[in-house]
Amino acid sequence: MDLHSILQPISTPSASVVTAPLPATIALPSPNYYYPPVAQGHYPVNNMWSLPSNVRVISSHGAPGHQTSASQPSTVMPALETNASNAQYYPAYSVINGNNSVQVASPAYTVSHSPHSFSNPRYVAVPQKSTSPNQVCSYCEPLPNHLTKTKSCSIPPILNSSDRSPLSLPTPYPVQYSTQPVSLPQPIAAPAPPSAESSKSTISDEDVAWQLIRLGALSSNSVKSSPSKSFVSISSPVQSTVKPTKASGVVKSEKVEKRSLPPQDFGNASSSTSAKRRRPDHNHTSTLDASSSNTSLASTGPMTVSSSTVERKGKEASEVNPNSTSSVTFSDFAAAISRSRCSRCKKSKKGCDRQRPCGRCRDAGLNSEDCISDDDMPVSNARKPRGRGRGRPKTKN
């Protein structure tokens, strides 16, 4: 079956227009453009399509073919093996010649043994109107089959008749061929914060201990900002209360010591020590000064400042450490001041209190009473060692 037998029943006596051989320009397709689906003037062909002999076809697959003997410049035709019995007819397309048009039915031949056969349908796009007398026929790449589930493609149609480069649309639009609904990923909900009840049930003993430590630190800070009286009552381990008693017309003060345990503080131990350091000393000092002055007036009359200071220091030491073996009294301190100091304690700034022997007597097993180091004067004529930092060798050559 040839083309003339197809065109003969369609041509009627009323349609006296004879279709002349029209050159057709087929542009090369581009894989990056989208060809729209079947619309007006488009029809699908299964594997290959047939056109008149004056229409040139350029295959985009570079298949070996044979040359045509047409009057136009030769182009490559794909090698086809057609069978007339397998021809399938499709709706006609319009061949435009000036202002007149002739309906032409085009069969679709099935490629049986060609190595360049295609399974997807092709689309032939013929414009409805043409400003030039020449016919324009666009040959497109195979589109994805509608029966298969293909995602999308973005290839615009080729509409340029003079240039072989495809015309790119400014906004290529994608087309979804998928028939199943697309399920978007749902956002993962953030875990809810633990409630108060659950957090109470999961608190461990270590958390309770840390909380008590924090509370202890807060209480120590509040103690620092409290008045001095409550301050001393909390931090100082020794509380002294003065009870005046009348004896021989002179008011004497007797100190009643009360031992009190320090409060249990889970915070750092430096809080109580820092509280002691920042405690105003005038209250405690004035009490001690008043008691010492009263005692001195009752017993021996006025004393020097140094002796009162020594007495005060001794009493403070006895109050702090009452279990000490040596009981310090005023007479001992007075004797210590008049007694000559040992050679070891002469060099010290605090002076010798004779409370402990020097290192030589201690090694010999002597106590502070039997210490004889005060008579052991250093020899002034002894040879002093020379330093070795000035280039002096230890041995002579």
Swiss-Prot record:
Residues 285-309, 320-330 have a biased composition (Polar residues). Residues 342-371 bind DNA. Residues 159-203, 221-397 are annotated as: Disordered. Residues 383-397 have a biased composition (Basic residues). PROSITE patterns: ZN2_CY6_FUNGAL_2 (PS50048). One of its GO terms (molecular function) is zinc ion binding. Transmembrane segments: none annotated. It is found in: Nucleus. GO terms for biological process: regulation of transcription by RNA polymerase II. InterPro entries: Zn2-C6_fun-type_DNA-bd_sf, Zn2Cys6_DnaBD. Residues 350-363 have a biased composition (Basic and acidic residues). Keywords: DNA-binding, Metal-binding, Nucleus, Transcription, Transcription regulation, Zinc. Residues 221-240 have a biased composition (Low complexity). One of its GO terms (cellular component) is nucleus. Its main location: nucleus. This is Uncharacterized transcriptional regulatory protein C56F2.05c. It comes from Schizosaccharomyces pombe (strain 972 / ATCC 24843) (Fission yeast).
